[in-house]
Amino acid sequence: MQLNPSEISELIKSRISGLGADAEVRNTGTVISVTDGICRVHGLSGVMQGEMLEFPGNTYGLALNLERDSVGAVVLGEYEHISEGDTVKCTGRILEVPVGKELLGRVVNTLGQPIDGKGPINAKETDVIEKVAPGVIARQSVSQPVQTGLKSIDAMVPIGRGQRELIIGDRQTGKTAVAVDSIINQKGKGVFCVYVAIGQKASTISNVVRKLEEHGAMEYTIVVAATASDSAAMQYLAAYAGCTMGEYFRDRGEDALIVYDDLTKQAWAYRQVSLLLRRPPGREAYPGDVFYLHSRLLERAARVNEDYVAKFTNGAVTGKTGSLTALPVIETQAGDVSAFVPTNVISITDGQIFLETDLFNAGIRPAINAGISVSRVGGAAQTKVIKKLSGGIRTDLAQYRELAAFAQFASDLDDATRKQLERGRRVTELLKQPQYQPLQVWQLAASLYAANNGFLDNVDVKDILPFEKGLHDHLKTKFADLVNRIEDTKDLSKEDEAALRAAIEDFRKSAAF
C-alpha cells in the first residue's frame, strides 16, 4: 500500500487537533498518617477551613485543622483503604447535603444518602450544612403554637413555632418519647418534621421509624441517622445536616420541627474528633469551642418574617412567614444539670422541659417536673382556650407539691389544706398520658375545664383517666358541634363554656363515677 506524503501530514494534523491538551490545575497533597478516621496530609497549600477533600476510592473528608506544614482532616465514612502516601485533592467545595420534599418519608445518613433500602433519592437541590443564622431584622416574634398533644407540655410549658425548647433528663426518663409524640401530633397541621438520631443504637432508631410509620407520621418526616457504629465525624455533623434539611422548609415560608436526639452524644463525638486532631482540651476534656458548637446550630432555629421569605424565594412566595422549631435533647448524669454541656444548652435555648427519674418511677409519665420546667417565649404562642384554662393547673400543682412535702410531718390538716391536696392528686393523675396517644386541642380543653371547675373532686384518683376518656367519647358522640367549634376557633366563648359545662354535667349524670 502506497501513502501519499500529503495524506500523512493531514492525518497527523487531524490527530493533533483531536487531542485535548487542557491541563487540570488542582491543589494536591500526600497522606502522612491515618488513625481513627483522622488523616494528616502534607501539601494542600491552598486548602480552606471546612473544605471537602477527595481521597482515593471515591471517599471524601473535611479539612478541620490548618497547620504550618500539614492539614488535619476527618474522613467521612470508611477509611480502612486509605494508606500513607495516597494522593489527596482539594475540591474547592464545602460539604453539601440534598434538600427538598423528595427526602420526606426516608431515612438518610449524615451525607443525605438513603439507608432504608428504598432506592435512590432524586433530590433536585443541595445546600451547605454550615450556614449563618438569620439576623435580628429577618426574624419575627414567636406567636403561633406547636401543639405537642401532651397535656402537661401544652398546658404548662407551651412551645411556639420558631422556639428552641430543651428536653433534658437522665437516661430512661422518656425524652425520646416526648419528642416522638410531638412529631406524631403534627399530622395534618402542615408542619414538616426532621428527626436527627445521634449516636443511638441502630435497633433503637429502627424502632422509632417503625412507630412513626405505624402512626402515618413518616409522610411528613425525614430521619437523619448517625448510629453508634458510625464514625465520630459523621455523628458530629449529623445535626447540621438535619438542620439544613429543615431550613429548606423554613426559608420557603413553611413550618418545620427538628428534634436533635441527642446533643450530649454530639458533644462527645466532637470532643473525640478534637482530641484526635490534638486540639487543647478544656473543662471535662471538651475543646474550647463546644459552646459555639451548639449555639451556631440552635440559633438557626427561628421564625423568619415575610420579607425574608419573599427575598429568599425571589418573590415566588409572598405573605408567608417561615419557622424552624428545635427540640434539642440533653442526657444528664444522675440529674446533674450543672455539668458543662447541660448548662451551655440551657443558656442557649428558650426554655427547658425537665424530666425526672423519681417521677418516672412513680408512674407519672411524661415525668415532667412542673416546678423547674419553663417556656420563655411559648406563652405568647399558646392557643386562647388553653391559655384561659391552664393558669390554674400550674398553681394547683406547685401548691400541691409544697403541701405534700409539708403534710408528711403534720398529723391533723384543716379542710382547706386537705381539699388542696385532693385537688393536687387529681391534677397529677390527670396529666398522666400513655405514649403515642397525643390529644387534640378540644380534648385538652375539656380535661382542663373539668379539673378547674371541680368536676373531678368527687371522682376517685384511680378513676380519673377512665373518667377523662369517657368524657372525651361522650363529647365526640353527643356534642360534635361544640367539639368542632372549639377545635376550629381554638377559643372558648361564653356560650361554648356554658355548653361545655352542661355537657360535662350531662356526662356526670350518665356515668358511674
Swiss-Prot record:
Subcellular localization: Cell inner membrane
EC number, as in UniProt: 7.1.2.2
Membrane topology: Peripheral membrane protein
Keyword Cell inner membrane recorded: yes
Catalytic activity from the UniProt record: ATP + H2O + 4 H(+)(in) = ADP + phosphate + 5 H(+)(out)
Molecular function as annotated in GO: ADP binding; ATP binding; proton-transporting ATP synthase activity, rotational mechanism
Record site: Required for activity: S373
Pfam families: ATP-synt_ab, ATP-synt_ab_C, ATP-synt_ab_N
Protein residues bound to ATP: G169, D170, R171, Q172, T173, G174, K175, T176
General function of this protein: Produces ATP from ADP in the presence of a proton gradient across the membrane. The alpha chain is a regulatory subunit.
Subunit structure comment from the entry: F-type ATPases have 2 components, CF(1) - the catalytic core - and CF(0) - the membrane proton channel. CF(1) has five subunits: alpha(3), beta(3), gamma(1), delta(1), epsilon(1). CF(0) has three main subunits: a(1), b(2) and c(9-12). The alpha and beta chains form an alternating ring which encloses part of the gamma chain. CF(1) is attached to CF(0) by a central stalk formed by the gamma and epsilon chains, while a peripheral stalk is formed by the delta and b chains.
Protein name in UniProt: ATP synthase subunit alpha
Origin species: Cupriavidus metallidurans (strain ATCC 43123 / DSM 2839 / NBRC 102507 / CH34)
Top-level taxonomy: Bacteria, Pseudomonadati, Pseudomonadota, Betaproteobacteria, Burkholderiales
